[in-house]
Amino acid sequence: IISTAHKPDEGVMIPGGICMHSLIFHVDVNSAFLSWESAKRLRDNPDALDLRTINAVIGGDEKMRHGVVLAKSPSAKKYGIMTGEPLSHARQKCPDLVVVPPDHELYAASSRKFIEILEEVAPVIEQCSIDEAFCDMTGTEKLYGDPIAFATKLKDRIYKELGFTVNIGISTNKLLAKMASDFEKPNRVHTLFPEEMAEKFWPLPVESLYGCGKTTAKRLRSLGITTIGALAKADRQMLLSNFKSQGDYLWESANGISSSAVTAESPANKGYGNSVTLPYDVTDTENAHHILLSLCETVGARIRYDKAYISVVQVQIVDNDFHHRCKQLSLPSATNVTEKIYEAACNAFDQGWDHAPIRLLGVSTSKATDESYEQYNLFDQDKFERLSKLNSAIDKIRDKYGDDAIVRACFADTHKN
């Protein structure tokens, strides 16, 4: 299903007959964690119930007050359930909700297979999270033909081979491609070329603009700016006066201006990361640490799946005023042990958080290598070896039997339901 069509020429012809020379795809897995779990269940048993068709979520420790929704089905979304929402709140909205515990090893494997398909067709890929990537398709029109037709074939191939759907947004830059992929879901291809902004982009509420948080949107509305189009036409100096440097970003984004290039990381600098946007404000350290643990589980599983090690951990914090704070720590030795990554993430968070209410948390790693340089005294070396073997055993058990087979204590109650 596509939202528009165009005829390729020497470049890519966009509505209005303008020839562009950059072609960017943003490929985003629909409800990734839930889709990957559903695809696995259907591969194992074709008669299994598809979680995507019922009121279901992937969630952490349901018995603890800070267990959160990690992914939701389309029908669960209709109840107003949001990613990052406490499971207790989700239950209140939908009493018959099916809660499935996370399987981080599955997510790592599914993400790798997803990216491998993109690597086969795209000259340059920038993986921006476990379930989404930008593809610079510039110059591929003569090889693949019409970009929209090719994007449709690509999403259909992903579904046929891997069992889950994706949305693909197409434009001349990363910002507009990402906005396009967020249009109607699931299993869609959408375009948002510059000539289409007046019709598809500017009528959207200002909250829809990527990078415009709720607090910023509220301030914009107080200034009479309610749509992206109104923001695009707003006085730039007025925006700078009210929002400082963010005013430039808002004005440029509303006008579809983005100079960010699709950049493939070299293997030597490859990193792993994951983040979650929260629909509620996190205001206590315990809750934040619990969310960090879930993120580190996924990141650690991906690192081990690639047989890699990392030596830098960074925590990203975005508060409810959209202020970004990052704290990075270098590890004494390269590792792929979840506990070590989590320990560093908590330390970085504790050092970097200014106690402002949090709306997004992220964990990323860098300086990846294919060798470990763990250096400990005899006691610590023994502890590391035990943790490493434990992580490896957990990965193998989860890979073979699913995440239900073995869980951390803080997730145990969820698995019993």
PLM region descriptions:
Residues 36, 333-417:
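Acidic, metal-coordinating catalytic segment for phosphate/diphosphate chemistry
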Residues 2-252, 301, 384-417:
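Gly/Gly-Pro- and Ser/Thr-rich, intrinsically disordered tail segments characteristic of DNA damage-repair
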Residues 30-32, 62-65, 320-323, 368-371:
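Short, charged/polar surface micro-motifs in flexible loops or helix N-caps
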Residues 14-19, 208, 218-358:
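DNA-contacting surface of Y-family translesion DNA polymerases
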